[in-house]
Regions:
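Short, surface-exposed alpha-helical segments at coil->helix boundaries
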Residues: 13-20, 151
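Hydrophobic, Leu/Ile/Phe/Ala-enriched alpha-helical segments that form helix-helix packing faces
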Residues: 23, 48, 186-190
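C-terminal catalytic-base region of ester-bond hydrolases, centering on the histidine
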Residues: 11, 123-195
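Serine-dependent carboxylesterase/thioesterase catalytic core
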Residues: 3-7, 14-17, 26-126, 138-141
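Structural alpha-beta junctions
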Residues: 24-27, 157-159
Length: 195
């Protein structure tokens, strides 16, 4: 099994240092949010083209990339655990993009963006868990949120397992409880692979 780590927007693969220290190294996918979702996705597909038995561990926007990748290469993917992934998009981005019209990231993460509209159409074919972070609060969002994305957006995709944790958007990558969730889901995929 190949663990593939995909970080969130404006982060780096180093955001997974603690998780990797407990789960082991894997393939680290780094990307630059300024390059645009479609360009980053194409580069990721190219880099994983010959990789089999993929199990994604992805944070926030990284989970949207993982979902698109799993849809494009279903025979290569075993499953995923995503952390704080806003499958319904970041609603605030649809408004902020008018104040930051040159921000490619804001255009890519809103509910009306291509990446989110396409993600909404994807039928998940693999064991897939989103760890929903429910602690935190941003004053820029009216809806209940984890400090960055809304809880509703994290629960948007109905065809995956949702596990709520009392953590915020950033604590989730530093949690032993979350690592246990990942280990259990990974073990289930390994057992299924051996059948």
């Amino acid at each position: 099994m190949n663990l593939v780590y995909i970080h969130g927007a404006s982060a780096t693969s180093e955001s997974f240092n603690y998780i990797r220290s407990k789960l082991g190294d894997g393939i680290n996918i780094d990307y630059d949010s300024r390059n645009g979702f479609e360009n980053n996705l194409a580069e990721m597909k190219q880099s994983l083209m010959n990789t089999k038995d993929i199990f994604f561990v992805a944070h926030s926007l990284g989970g949207i990339y993982a979902l698109h990748l799993a849809n494009h290469m279903p025979s290569q993917v075993l499953g995923a655990v995503t952390l704080s992934t806003p499958y319904g998009g970041a609603e605030v981005a649809d408004y902020v993009q008018y104040f930051l019209p040159f921000s490619r990231l804001m255009r890519d993460i809103g509910p009306s963006s291509w990446s989110m509209r396409q993600a909404d159409k994807i039928k998940i074919q693999h064991p897939w868990t989103n760890v929903v972070t429910v602690r935190g609060q941003s004053p820029f969002m009216l809806a209940h949120n984890d400090g960055v994305v809304t809880i509703t957006s994290q629960k948007h995709h109905a065809d995956m397992e949702l596990v709520e944790v009392e953590l915020n958007h950033y604590e989730v990558v530093l949690s032993d409880a979350v690592i246990d969730i990942i280990k259990k889901r990974r073990a289930a995929c390994v057992a299924k692979l051996k059948q």
